[in-house]
């Protein structure tokens, strides 16, 4: 890879924990929705074009496992050959990925 290009950034919805309306959604499923939307906002970019996914996640443990970026990217249709990394900066994780 010669050039790194950020094509899009999306934030997931925010809800009340642990009993809010989003509490029934798995974190990796929610993140995959954000990845699909990021791709939808980038004209001409398909999942096959993605070489790397960088995903901010404040609490990357629990049922989604410790590499939520990898699981979410696969669930979003990004090829298995693409890399993915989870950035944990707690409350500022999403900002660190921008």
Where do the PLM segments sit?
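Short glycine- and Lys/Arg-enriched binding-loop motifs that mark or flank ligand-binding interfaces
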Residues: 11, 16, 52, 58-61, ...
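Short, well-ordered amphipathic alpha-helical segments that serve as non-catalytic structural scaffolds
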Residues: 27-43, 68-72, 97
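Conserved catalytic cysteine-centered active-site region
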Residues: 57-98
């Amino acid at each position: 890879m010669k050039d790194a290009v950020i094509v899009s950034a999306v934030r997931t919805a925010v809800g009340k924990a642990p009993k809010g309306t989003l509490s029934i959604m798995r974190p990796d499923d929610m993140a995959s929705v954000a990845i699909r939307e990021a791709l939808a906002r980038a004209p001409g970019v398909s999942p096959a074009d993605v070489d790397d996914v960088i995903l901010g996640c404040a609490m990357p443990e629990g049922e989604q496992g410790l590499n939520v970026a990898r699981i979410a990217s696969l669930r979003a249709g990004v090829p298995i050959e693409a890399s993915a990394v989870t950035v944990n900066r707690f409350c500022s994780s999403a900002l660190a990925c921008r």
